[in-house]
Each structure stands twice: as C-alpha cells, then as structure tokens.
Amino acid sequence: MRHIKVNVKGQVQGVGFRYFTQQAATENAIVGWVRNEDDGSVLIEAQGEDKNVDAFLNEVEKGPTKFARVQDMEVKELAEDTELTKFEVKY
C-alpha cells in the first residue's frame, strides 16, 4: 500500500484537471482527494496498491487535454491512512 501527497504545477487549473484526476483515481482503485490551491497548483492525496499508484501518477502527469500542461510534480510519501475510503474533489 502506498499513500502519497502530490503537488502538481503548470497549467492545471481551468482545464478539467480535478475531474480528470478523479476519473484516473477511480480507474486505478485509488482513494483520496484532489483540490485547487491558491497558487495555481493542484494538490492530490492518493492511496492504493503500489502498481495502481504508479499507473495513476503516469495518467496525472499526462493531463486531461492538450490545454493542460504539467510542468512539475512533487511527490511526498505518507503513512497509510485507513480513513480514506473514496476519491473526491474538494473545494
């Protein structure tokens, strides 16, 4: 099991990034959340099986459309959180 926090920087707001991230999480059996940050980045907390988290990160790095552009992804490893049960978009 892998639990991470990811700060995604680039053109990632106003391009459907959060909903794309939620879809990628669902497809890869990931629980956690995603939200826009005031600095223009997107913050993601994600937890799942190691291979699923890797696949999820690959999808997130590609982005939802040609209008989205991921310039940097800072990944921080966290301790497992047993209270995460679904993936949601936070506001």
UniProtKB/Swiss-Prot annotation:
SUPFAM superfamilies: Acylphosphatase/BLUF domain-like. It catalyses: an acyl phosphate + H2O = a carboxylate + phosphate + H(+). This is Acylphosphatase. It comes from Oceanobacillus iheyensis (strain DSM 14371 / CIP 107618 / JCM 11309 / KCTC 3954 / HTE831). Coiled coil: none annotated. Keywords: Hydrolase. It comes from the Bacteria. Its EC number is 3.6.1.7. PROSITE patterns: ACYLPHOSPHATASE_1 (PS00150), ACYLPHOSPHATASE_2 (PS00151), ACYLPHOSPHATASE_3 (PS51160). The active site is at residues 18, 36. One of its GO terms (molecular function) is acylphosphatase activity.
